[in-house]
Regions:
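Radical SAM enzyme [4Fe-4S]-AdoMet core and its adjacent flexible, acidic
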Residues: 3-6, 10, 14, 20-33, ...
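Local cysteine-cluster metal-coordination motifs and their immediate loop/turn environment
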Residues: 63-69, 112-113, 171-182, 564
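Iron-sulfur (Fe-S) cluster-binding segments and ferredoxin-like electron-carrier domains
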Residues: 72-77, 118-123, 181-191, 566-576
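Radical SAM/AdoMet-radical enzyme domain recognition
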Residues: 198-216, 225-344
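C-terminal target-recognition/interaction regions appended to catalytic cores
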Residues: 494-653, 676-678
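A short acidic, helix-capping loop that chelates divalent metal ions and anchors anionic groups
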Residues: 185-187, 278-284, 350-353
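N-terminal [4Fe-4S]-dependent radical SAM core
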Residues: 35-165
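Conserved alpha-helical substructure of the radical SAM core
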Residues: 118, 122, 132-257, 261
Length: 706
């Protein structure tokens, strides 16, 4: 684009600044009251009516003892305590302080029984402060929800969430570390019936506010469920616009037919486990060709019309150096990747009993992520380009306003706590691959504040659309935008995202066709959203985050916050045990064993080939050996083996000391040639010699969890 056009756009920016002054003054005159939409029994909130939890530091919050909770949960699982105790008592709860010390934000807490605990929340206080100050406030309080939100202090109290997660099965075809659910290791199968799946989806749309959500089918591995495709189709039938699967991609890589069938059923996204570039970077997952599997899954799914969201669990010392590689992969393939989700590790499931040494070494926060992306990619200023995920709720409020009181559904709204998740957007030219952070050419902080004023005035659809347009234009810098990006491209992007004007950009509904998919993909500009979602564990648990969770789990016992289900008090273990389908032995007798890829086993694929652009230096890079060099265990299995070896060594040393005591203190003679006679070891009360096995067979001591 010529400089002349950029200067013309700059003139339009100045014109928008002047028009905004007039618009804002008119808006101040008798603003309209909020309406109560069909999808809620409470009116839309003005920006100044939104509640906020205590923020800043030092502050006190409610947390959990990392030792009390597993002890109490075990009593419930063993039948010694009823699970109702979780509804009526503050089980395992203790106070915690969030403080600043030595340039870090920490959570510190003390249990009268188990002592002191602390963990890092952020390595950058300025970044942490920026996120909390950018939080716009909580969504409408949840209502008409008594049937599903009934979990004591773990109850979700605000909003509707943005991703309804349903675990179809706890069976998996991998044996990962880490794993939220400890798949394939709990001794039983928990797999939803078709009636249970339909009931959960039907119940979910009774809660108010009735907002659009992404329904995510998870597991285990959801594609192992016989009802996977039916569940996708039924979700679309009851009205959800976005249906996704959280998958390791193995079945999608093996079968193009499955990809096509999933797309036809209405699957829109696959949240694809994706821990790095190259097989070495994925070696901690113990599948021999896992990166090749990911590439084939991306190829097959995109070809079928399903969009892919690579999801990376980041662990310090395991794959933290891969953050930049993964972003470069997305930048190199803008026609196939439009969303990245990074998830700093949560020590739960297989890792709940983690040692302090490994926890401190592997802990990775959202602040680590923001700084790693800047260091590894040269992208993003932490306190300028990153915002809490909930920052986008102001834009959802605007969309609720323009769609009016008769809308059947509210907009998807990410109203989570500012400590939960962050996001940054890049605008990428699909043709030239030039990119820039959206916040480099659009002052998003000012846009959000302007938009809040538009929302508070509530002037109706078209005046609100004009107000949003002026807010965008007056805060736009054309000279910082990608070369060929225009103001009109920006306005079109917002219109496409929120369906503001009703223009057809290609349907996203359940009856969408391949033509609709191609139409939406024809946009020259890829709005690459990079998200970081940090799920809690027992060491950093904060009930203020749980109360406004945006990722509820649908279960046989109602809807439960993601963190309360997987970590927190651990509702997952309790509910799956309560509603277990069969013991493993019984399941294997009736259904046989499903194939599991572990121990370096490779996945066989009938179709091999893709058109993805790869950086071969990244592909061929070695695995991260940081923890090996430090002598620290990398996962729970290694910790168990080390603990066993330490015990064996300790037992041997104790036996040696006992022998020395008998020799030098008691005056006993040592056995000749180191051979201990039967008389020396037989019980004193038994004069008969015990029979001796002349041909003993070696036995390997099992490790718990093998």
């Amino acid at each position: 684009m010529s400089k002349a056009i950029k200067y013309a756009e700059k003139a339009a920016v100045y014109a928008a600044k002047g028009a905004w002054v007039v618009y804002e003054r008119l808006n101040r005159i008798s603003p309209n009251p909020s309406f109560t939409p069909k999808w809620s029994e409470k009116p839309l909130l003005k920006s100044y009516q939104k509640e906020k939890p205590p923020l800043g530091w030092p502050r006190t919050t409610d947390s959990l003892c990392p030792k009390c909770v597993p002890e109490i949960r075990k009593q419930i699982l063993d039948g010694k305590l009823p699970h109702e105790v979780l509804l009526n008592e503050k089980v395992g709860e203790i106070k915690a302080q969030i403080i600043e010390r030595d340039g870090k934000i920490l959570m510190v807490k003390d249990c009268p029984k188990h002592g002191h605990f602390e963990d890092v929340m952020s390595i950058d206080p300025a970044f942490f402060k920026h996120l909390e100050e950018s939080f716009p406030g909580r969504d409408i309080r949840a209502h008409n929800d008594e049937k599903l939100h009934k979990h004591g202090t773990s109850t979700v109290t605000h909003g509707r969430g943005s991703v309804l997660t349903i675990d179809l099965t706890n069976r998996c075809n991998m044996m990962c570390d880490p794993c939220f659910m400890d798949a394939n290791q709990v001794g039983f199968v928990h797999e939803l019936t078709w009636d249970e799946i339909k009931t959960m989806l039907d119940n979910a749309i009774t809660i108010k506010p009735k907002r659009q959500m992404s329904v995510q089918f998870s597991g285990g591995e959801p594609t192992l469920s016989p009802y996977f495709l039916d569940a996708v189709a039924y979700s679309r039938k009851v009205g959800y616009n976005s249906v996704q699967a959280a998958s390791n991609g193995i079945e999608f890589a093996k079968s193009k037919e499955l990809c096509r069938a999933a797309a036809e059923a209405g699957l829109r996204y696959v949240y694809l486990q994706f821990d790095g570039i190259g097989n070495a970077a994925n070696s901690h997952r113990k599948v021999g060709n896992l990166f090749d599997v990911k590439l084939q899954a991306i190829n097959n799914l995109h070809e079928a019309g399903v969009d892919i969201v690579p999801v990376t669990t980041i662990i310090n010392g395991i794959n933290n150096e891969q953050v930049g590689h993964i972003i470069q992969f997305a930048l190199d393939n803008p026609k196939k990747i439009s969303f990245l989700s990074f998830q700093p590790v949560s020590f739960t499931g297989r890792d709940e009993d983690i040692t302090d040494e490994r926890r401190f070494a592997q802990r990775y926060t959202l602040s680590h992520m923001a700084h790693d992306i800047k260091t590894q990619c040269g992208i993003g200023e932490p306190a300028r380009d990153w915002f809490p995920i909930s920052f986008m709720s102001t834009f959802s409020d605007w969309a609720d306003l323009i769609h009016g009181p008769a809308a059947e559904w509210g907009q998807l709204s990410c109203g989570c706590h500012p400590n939960c998740g962050i996001g940054m957007a890049l605008m990428i030219d699909k043709e030239t691959k030039e990119s820039a952070p959206v916040t480099a050419f659009l002052n998003m902080d000012k846009v959000a504040k302007d938009l809040a004023k538009v929302n508070d005035a509530a002037r109706g659809k078209w005046l609100s659309v004009i107000g949003f347009g002026l807010a965008l234009m007056r805060n736009y810098d054309p000279f910082q935008a990608p070369t060929h990006f225009k103001i009109t491209d920006m306005l079109r992007k917002m219109d496409k995202t929120f369906n503001a004007t009703g223009k057809d950009y290609g349907s996203v509904k359940g009856d969408r066709t391949m033509e609709d998919i191609k139409k939406r993909r024809s946009d020259r500009w890829n709005f690459l959203f990079i998200a970081g979602m940090w799920f809690q564990d027992l060491f950093n648990y904060d009930f203020r985050r749980t109360e406004q969770c945006i990722i509820p789990y649908a279960t046989q016992e109602g809807e439960i916050s993601f963190c309360a289900y997987n970590t927190g008090i651990g509702w997952r273990n309790i509910i799956e045990k309560m509603h277990m389908t069969a013991t493993l032995t019984k399941w294997y007798e009736e259904h046989g064993r499903h194939e599991i890829f572990a121990g370096g086993k490779k996945v066989g694929m009938s179709h091999v080939g893709h058109e993805l652009v790869l950086n071969m230096e990244h592909v061929n890079s070695e695995a991260n050996h940081t923890l090996d060099n430090l002598g620290i265990a990398k996962n729970a299995r290694e910790e168990r083996i080390r603990a066993r070896d330490t015990k064996v060594k300790s037992d041997a040393e104790n036996a040696k000391m006992a022998q020395l005591y008998r020799e030098h203190v008691l005056g006993e003679k040592p056995p000749a040639d180191g051979i201990v006679s039967v008389n020396m070891i037989r019980p004193a009360t038994n004069n008969a010699a015990s029979p001796i096995n002349r041909n003993p067979q070696p036995a390997e001591e099992p490790v718990a969890g093998d």
